[in-house]
Amino acid sequence: MISPLPTPCEWVDGKAGVSIPLDDRGLNYADGAFETMSCSSGEIACQSLHSDRLSLALEALRFPHPEAIAQRVFDDICRCVASVGHSGTARLTVTRGSGPRGYAPPDSASPRHILTLFPLSGQTPDRQSCGIAQIRWAHQPQLAGLKLLARTEQVLAAREAATQQWDDMLMLDAQDHVISTSRGNIFVFFGNQCVTPDLSQCGIAGTRRQLLIETVLPQLNYVVDEQPLTLAVLRQADAVLISNTVRGVVSMSRIEDQHYPESAFPRRIQDALRQQVASWVGG
């Protein structure tokens, strides 16, 4: 059952009922970054992880004083989320603000932030099917790992999934390395060994991915390695899991004609991640 939304549920620079100007550079040039976050009873989970990643994205985009901007923005959105006691998800978008025509950002730009709240969705399936997307991740190491507004590859991959009736699409780079799905990060299991793709050239380094690598999987006695990954390796795996903020952890039932048996251990990882996220609520 989908929970009702609070009122207000949208803010621009901390103010409800404000429109976004047509000269906003996020709208015109995707000049900005965003974060998707989970909230519980008016508090944002993994707040510091999201704030740190936002700061890195703003630094890569050459925003002035990125850490200060991220801190100010999170102070503001935490107030908004708390004011309505929201439980569900939230999207934070930070743009460079308004500016004249042309790619070059103005020196006088004033960053703008938009917060949108979404209700708790109904229960999602524990397992999902994946096709293999035709669209490939482009290498751009200067922007790798960051959640920037320009998400063209994932938009096209998601369109492929809908057209071909897959739950999600596996996304590779031009060198045929597996990077992610259109919705999340990938973890491949061989016994107690876990491999997750190296994201130094492209992809998004998710906050749930970070928790899994640094805390959850080691606590469950898995050895985690970040390295290039191929489809051939995936086909030999015991299990493949996908992580993101909204769904937590979901296991793959199949990748095209490759089927993976149902197992209890993805549920243990899901439960452990959920407990870890709960401990980060408000922090």
Regions found by a protein language model. Give the residues of each.
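Helix-start/capping segments and mature chain N-termini
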Residues: 1-79, 95, 100, 104-283
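Ordered, amphipathic secondary-structure segments that act as subunit-interaction surfaces
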Residues: 83-94, 101
